[in-house]
């Protein structure tokens, strides 16, 4: 089975995130995508709140998609969330006979060498990297450009910002078209202050 893992803050999840999931399902022949809202990020100060809300939004968006699972594996974990640790848990749950993929943005690939056990990660899974549509200036290390376990997609990266959405909600601006209409009211209620 081909399993893609899509971790992130999803603070909140928006249409751009959904389009990436749709693209991977339709074009890369995945059997399953596991959406994992981060618990405590390892790469920045913990300014994430509303874990339950972020999880609820993701679940609501994908509740009718049998190929998408939303997991609380990192939210329930103690301490900082590391992709390496999460992947090992998922391999234990689903079995090592499956093929695992990690979905990331080009900015994450640029910093991959700072990730915990990144070389071992590259042996345990393949990385699906979405390039940003408007930013071709990010330099990618040759080690990654020539690695068979890194798939760089020159596909449009759906450039919507969760920060932009939170700011619009705080300023009582319309977020239609930026978030799934199924969760628009929930986002407006939960992110108002």
Swiss-Prot record:
Recite the UniProt keywords alphabetically: ATP-binding, NAD, Nucleotide-binding, Nucleotidyltransferase, Pyridine nucleotide biosynthesis, Transferase
Per the record, the similarity remark reads: Belongs to the NadD family.
Q: Quote the Gene3D superfamilies the UniProt record gives.
A: HUPs
**EC number(s) from the headed UniProt entry:** 2.7.7.18
The family database entries (InterPro entries) matched by this protein are listed as: Cyt_trans-like, NadD/NMNAT, Rossmann-like_a/b/a_fold
- One Pfam family from the UniProt entry? CTP_transf_like
What Gene Ontology molecular-function terms does this entry list? ATP binding; nicotinate-nucleotide adenylyltransferase activity
Q: Which domain of life is it from?
A: Bacteria
User: SUPFAM superfamilies, per this entry?
Assistant: Nucleotidylyl transferase
Look at the named UniProt entry and state the broad enzyme category this protein falls under.
Answer: transferase
The signal peptide stretch is none
- Function field: Catalyzes the reversible adenylation of nicotinate mononucleotide (NaMN) to nicotinic acid adenine dinucleotide (NaAD).
GO BP terms: namely: NAD biosynthetic process
This protein is called: Probable nicotinate-nucleotide adenylyltransferase
Q: Which reaction does it catalyse?
A: nicotinate beta-D-ribonucleotide + ATP + H(+) = deamido-NAD(+) + diphosphate
